[in-house]
């Protein structure tokens, strides 16, 4: 049966290595449900969701993280936004035909991975790594080696559970400022690599960890729920309308009678008529409710 959308952190007591395990189903379904993506695009978004959750858990502060793929291929953009509360949303931009068996490089073309970290307090950081690996996991491992000089392995699996899309992943990372041995890390990575997709997506986390590491001493911390959460709102749309020239807004109102602002992440529509626009220009909050 599918597992709850949760992230589990764990630590190897005899090695200076930390780990994470995440499984997502409901969150993934909510990201996909308002779009008719080809299957290869769904798979990439599933992998991005898992990767973003795992990367977010490595942050030691409150803030947001965005992991995006950009390129000149038929999938020009795929992005997941997350935060330290494990609240996620995501979207992809697709143009042209996509083969059923398209791999990552076919989808993205000449491209790169962009990781943007925005602390609630402090400066924003952005890292860019070329799409040189064959998989998203390989690209992100390269990112960690370049940006943090920390040996890191990611193991990402996608599939279906009870006919619904699901995904899971694991992360292993040598802890900074620790005297970890590369041989120990490679040993743990070899064990982790044996995880089967069905096991990761359907078994409780503790059972997965026992199957992989039953000969090791592992401390598992309390899990953290992962959920879909969109940050769009009528107020944000109103703020965006304030930035447009009055002539442009008035022209749309004259042609359409109202302005329909659509959120690509969650599918919500926000409608603004002439009275709403007048209130916005007077710095008043529009009263009309959002329309789904």
From Swiss-Prot:
Localization per record: Cytoplasm
Keyword Disulfide bond: yes
Pfam families: HSP33
An annotated GO BP: protein refolding
InterPro entries named in the record: Heat_shock_Hsp33 (IPR000397), Heat_shock_Hsp33_C (IPR016154), Heat_shock_Hsp33_N (IPR016153), Hsp33_helix_hairpin_bin_dom_sf (IPR023212)
Keywords tagged on the record: Chaperone, Cytoplasm, Disulfide bond, Redox-active center, Stress response, Zinc
Keyword Zinc: yes
PTM text: Under oxidizing conditions two disulfide bonds are formed involving the reactive cysteines. Under reducing conditions zinc is bound to the reactive cysteines and the protein is inactive.
Annotated S-S bridges: 230-232, 263-266
Chief place of localization: cytoplasm
One term under GO cellular component: cytoplasm
Molecular function terms, GO-annotated: protein folding chaperone; unfolded protein binding
Origin superkingdom: Bacteria
Family, similarity comment: Belongs to the HSP33 family.
NCBIfam families registered for this protein in UniProt: PRK00114.1 (NF001033)
PANTHER family (alphabetical): 33 KDA CHAPERONIN
Function, as annotated: Redox regulated molecular chaperone. Protects both thermally unfolding and oxidatively damaged proteins from irreversible aggregation. Plays an important role in the bacterial defense system toward oxidative stress.
Protein name (record): 33 kDa chaperonin
Provenance organism: Escherichia fergusonii (strain ATCC 35469 / DSM 13698 / CCUG 18766 / IAM 14443 / JCM 21226 / LMG 7866 / NBRC 102419 / NCTC 12128 / CDC 0568-73)
Originating gene: hslO
């Amino acid at each position: 049966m599918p597992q709850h959308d949760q992230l589990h952190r764990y630590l190897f007591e005899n090695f200076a290595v930390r780990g994470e395990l995440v499984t997502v189903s409901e969150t993934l379904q909510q990201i996909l449900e308002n779009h008719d993506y080809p299957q290869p695009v769904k798979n990439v978004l599933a992998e991005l969701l898992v990767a973003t959750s795992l990367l977010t858990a490595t942050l030691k502060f409150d803030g947001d993280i965005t992991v995006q793929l950009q390129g000149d291929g038929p999938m020009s953009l795929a992005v997941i936004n997350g935060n330290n509360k494990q609240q996620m949303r995501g979207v992809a931009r697709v143009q042209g035909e996509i083969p059923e068996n398209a791999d990552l490089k076919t989808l993205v073309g000449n491209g790169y991975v962009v990781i943007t970290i925005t602390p609630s307090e402090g400066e924003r950081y952005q890292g860019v790594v070329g799409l040189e690996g064959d998989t998203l996991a390989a690209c992100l491992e390269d990112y960690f080696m370049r940006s943090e000089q920390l040996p890191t392995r990611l193991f990402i699996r996608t599939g279906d559970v009870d006919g619904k899309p699901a995904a899971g992943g694991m992360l292993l990372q040598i802890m900074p400022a620790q005297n970890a041995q590369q041989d120990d890390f490679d040993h743990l990575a070899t064990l982790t690599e044996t995880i089967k997709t069905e096991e990761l997506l359907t078994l409780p986390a503790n059972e997965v960890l026992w199957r992989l590491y039953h000969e090791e001493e592992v401390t598992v911390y309390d899990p953290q729920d992962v959920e879909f959460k969109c940050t769009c709102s009528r107020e944000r749309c109103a703020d965006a309308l304030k930035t447009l020239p009055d002539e442009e807004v008035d022209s749309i109102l004259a042609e359409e009678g109202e302005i329909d602002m659509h959120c690509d992440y969650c599918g919500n529509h926000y409608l603004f008529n002439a009275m709403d626009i007048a209130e916005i220009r007077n710095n008043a909050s529009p009263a009309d409710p959002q329309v789904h």
